[in-house]
């Protein structure tokens, strides 16, 4: 009985861990949220650390939780209106540098959610890097998390 409990607890810890290392790329502090239970879109945020001697570039993202998953950012137009746009050129992660995907800035956008985001739900996501290749990460939904904007 104790062994079964330990295995279950350890498996849960691994699944809920917000830290993933894939070679020289380290993902930490990953979480996702949406505007509410009826939202058709959601977003994910995280820290990406590049421990290699050369810059890499996050060039894409994929998840089965939504019809479409993209890298997005917010831009202000000439009239001062802020709008969300897809990042086509990818996101550079400098050598030995950390880059944050944050609310109000660069982030992962899930459009056409296939199911509601509920706190505690695990979302499997694949990040695609030019050099590091595919990096799988399990992102935990945290609807209650509310952080201030970070600058890049």
Regions found by a protein language model. Give the residues of each.
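Positively charged n-region of N-terminal signal peptides that target proteins for export
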Residues: 1-5
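Bacterial N-terminal signal peptides
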Residues: 8-18
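Compact, glycine-rich, soluble single-domain proteins
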Residues: 24-152
